[in-house]
C-alpha cells in the first residue's frame, strides 16, 4: 500500500509540475501578445496581422487564441480612454445636455454624432459578416491586406499634399466622419489595419495627419470595445479562471505599452509621413511571402 501511495504522490507531483510549466508558458504567451497588441493597435501596420503572425510563429493558432487576441484589445482601448479622457468626457456631456436639458451650443464641437457616423458602417458590416470574418484569418490574406493597405497609405499621403486641410478636430464635418467610417470597413480584411484605414481615409477626405490620427483613436473605442465584448460573450463557456487571469495580464500589458505608443505617435505624426509605415508593410508582406514559399 505504501508503494502505491508513493507512486500516486509522484504522479500527482509530475502532473502539478507539468501543469505549472504549461501555465507559465501561457502567461509568457499572453504577455507577448499584450506587447504586440500595445505596439501595433493604433499604428497603421495592422495589429491583427501581427498577432496572427506571432501565433503562427509560436505554433499556437486556434479559435480560442484568436478570441484571446481580440479580447485583450480592451487593454489598448483603456489607454485611449485615459489619454483622451477630457475630450471623451466633453463629448458625452454635450450629448447629455442636448438630450436631457435641451441645451444647444453655437460653437462647433466634435460630438457623439460624429462618432456614431464614423462607426455605423463598421457596426452594420460587422453584424452581417461576423461569422465569416474569422474564415480569412490566414497568412495569405494578411499578406495581401498588408500590401493593399500600404498602397492606401500612399494614396492618403498623396492627398495630404493638397491644401487646405482640416487642422482642428472640432471642424470635422458629419460627411467626413461618415466617409472615414466607410473606409474603416476595409479593416475587416485582416492585414489592412483599422488605424491605416481610418487615418488614410481621413487624409483622403481632407484632414491633416494629427487630426486624422486623433479621430481614428476616437473611433477605435466603440468599435474595438464592441468587438471584444461580443467575442467574450461568444466564447464565455470556454473561459475558465486561469483564462481570466491570463486575459487580465495580457490586457494590462497592452494598456501600458499602448500608452507609450500612442503618445509617441501623436508627437511625430504631424511632421512624419505615413510612407515609412507603408514601406514597413511591404517588407513584412515580403517576409510572409518568403516564409510561405520556404
Swiss-Prot record:
GO cellular component, one term: plasma membrane
Topology within the bilayer: Multi-pass membrane protein
Catalytic reaction annotation: di-trans,octa-cis-undecaprenyl diphosphate + H2O = di-trans,octa-cis-undecaprenyl phosphate + phosphate + H(+)
Matches recorded under InterPro entries: UppP
Entry keyword set: Antibiotic resistance, Cell inner membrane, Cell membrane, Cell shape, Cell wall biogenesis/degradation, Hydrolase, Membrane, Peptidoglycan synthesis, Transmembrane, Transmembrane helix
GO molecular function: undecaprenyl-diphosphatase activity
Localization per Swiss-Prot or TrEMBL: Cell inner membrane
Keyword Membrane among record annotations: yes
EC class: hydrolase
HAMAP family: Undec_diphosphatase
NCBIfam families on file: undec_PP_bacA
Family per similarity comment: Belongs to the UppP family.
Name listed for the protein in its UniProt record: Undecaprenyl-diphosphatase
Organism: Blochmanniella pennsylvanica (strain BPEN)
Gene that encodes the chain: uppP
Amino acid at each position: 500500500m505504501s508503494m502505491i501511495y508513493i507512486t500516486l504522490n509522484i504522479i500527482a507531483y509530475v502532473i502539478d509540475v507539468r501543469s505549472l510549466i504549461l501555465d507559465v508558458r501561457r502567461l509568457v504567451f499572453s504577455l507577448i501578445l499584450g506587447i504586440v497588441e500595445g505596439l501595433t493597435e493604433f499604428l497603421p501596420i495592422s495589429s491583427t496581422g501581427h498577432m496572427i503572425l506571432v501565433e503562427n510563429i509560436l505554433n499556437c493558432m486556434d479559435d480560442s487564441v484568436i478570441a484571446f487576441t481580440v479580447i485583450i484589445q480592451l487593454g489598448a482601448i483603456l489607454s485611449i480612454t485615459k489619454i483622451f479622457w477630457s475630450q471623451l468626457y466633453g463629448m458625452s456631456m454635450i450629448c447629455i445636455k442636448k438630450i436631457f436639458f435641451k441645451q444647444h451650443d453655437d460653437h462647433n464641437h466634435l460630438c457623439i454624432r460624429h462618432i456614431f457616423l464614423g462607426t455605423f458602417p463598421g457596426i452594420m458590416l460587422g453584424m452581417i459578416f461576423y461569422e465569416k470574418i474569422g474564415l480569412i484569418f490566414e497568412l495569405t490574406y494578411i499578406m495581401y491586406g498588408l500590401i493593399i493597405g500600404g498602397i492606401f497609405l500612399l494614396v492618403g499621403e498623396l492627398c495630404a499634399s493638397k491644401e487646405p486641410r482640416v487642422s482642428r478636430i472640432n471642424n470635422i464635418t458629419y460627411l467626413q466622419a461618415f466617409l472615414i467610417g466607410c473606409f474603416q470597413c476595409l479593416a475587416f480584411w485582416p492585414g489592412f489595419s483599422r488605424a491605416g484605414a481610418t487615418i488614410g481615409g481621413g487624409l483622403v477626405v481632407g484632414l491633416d495627419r494629427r487630426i486624422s490620427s486623433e479621430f481614428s483613436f476616437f473611433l477605435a473605442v466603440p468599435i474595438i470595445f464592441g468587438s471584444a465584448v461580443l467575442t467574450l460573450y461568444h466564447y464565455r463557456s470556454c473561459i475558465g479562471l486561469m483564462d481570466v487571469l491570463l486575459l487580465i495580464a495580457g490586457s494590462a500589458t497592452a494598456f501600458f505599452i499602448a500608452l507609450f505608443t500612442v503618445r509617441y505617435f501623436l508627437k511625430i505624426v504631424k511632421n512624419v509621413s505615413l510612407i515609412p509605415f507603408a514601406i514597413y508593410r511591404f517588407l513584412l508582406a515580403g517576409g510572409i511571402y518568403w516564409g510561405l514559399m520556404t
